Amino acid sequence: MSEMQTREMLIGEIKLFNKWSYDFIEVRDPSLKKYICLKPVYLPHSGGRHEHKRFGKALVPIVERLINNVMRPGRNMGKKHLAYNIVKKSFELIYLKTGENPLQVLVRAIENAAPREETTRIMYGGITYHVSVDIAPLRRIDLALRHLTEGARLKAFHNPISIEEALAEEIALAASNDPKSYAVQKKEEIERIALSSR
């Protein structure tokens, strides 16, 4: 038995929040497979080490990217521990609702909420045209995560429902491709606008 194998046996399996395994998480969308990082980590906190590398975001664990999106608006900026606890509690709620590994549910939600095409403005002869373009995989993931957290935030704002429950519900709805999900609605809206400007 090699030294590496004995070390792995002593440490045990690395699990997210010490509960959910990274094994057998399937990414069905081939374009997103390379960019959804499911590398096992004890704590999803890289400290921005990816910042100065090109496409470094692709190496950041997907749960950390979700946590970073949860602490998005001004009053929550910098409160990563608060965002960490929100995601942790929402993952527990997802597990209670679905009975599945919350990581798998999150990956499915990202696949369903990631738009495939959008519009961009092109100036031609002094006139601005909106033209439909394909979206890069990293941007697809960024938009999906942004819409998931935005939907949870809107659902919890001025409402008795907590942000943890709202995030869990939004991820679960997006994973089942439910049109009641804010992220799925935004995806369909973006794709509809892109289709009309082809």
Curated annotation (Swiss-Prot):
NCBIfam families: PRK04027.1, uS7_euk_arch. GO terms for biological process: translation. InterPro entries: Ribosomal_uS7 (IPR000235), Ribosomal_uS7_arc (IPR026018), Ribosomal_uS7_CS (IPR020606), Ribosomal_uS7_dom (IPR023798), Ribosomal_uS7_dom_sf (IPR036823), Ribosomal_uS7_euk/arc (IPR005716). This is Small ribosomal subunit protein uS7. Part of the 30S ribosomal subunit. Transmembrane segments: none annotated. GO terms for molecular function: rRNA binding; structural constituent of ribosome. Belongs to the universal ribosomal protein uS7 family. It comes from Desulfurococcus amylolyticus (strain DSM 18924 / JCM 16383 / VKM B-2413 / 1221n) (Desulfurococcus kamchatkensis). GO terms for cellular component: small ribosomal subunit. Gene3D superfamilies: Ribosomal protein S7 domain. Keywords: Ribonucleoprotein, Ribosomal protein, RNA-binding, rRNA-binding. One of the primary rRNA binding proteins, it binds directly to 16S rRNA where it nucleates assembly of the head domain of the 30S subunit. Is located at the subunit interface close to the decoding center. It holds the Pfam family Ribosomal_S7.
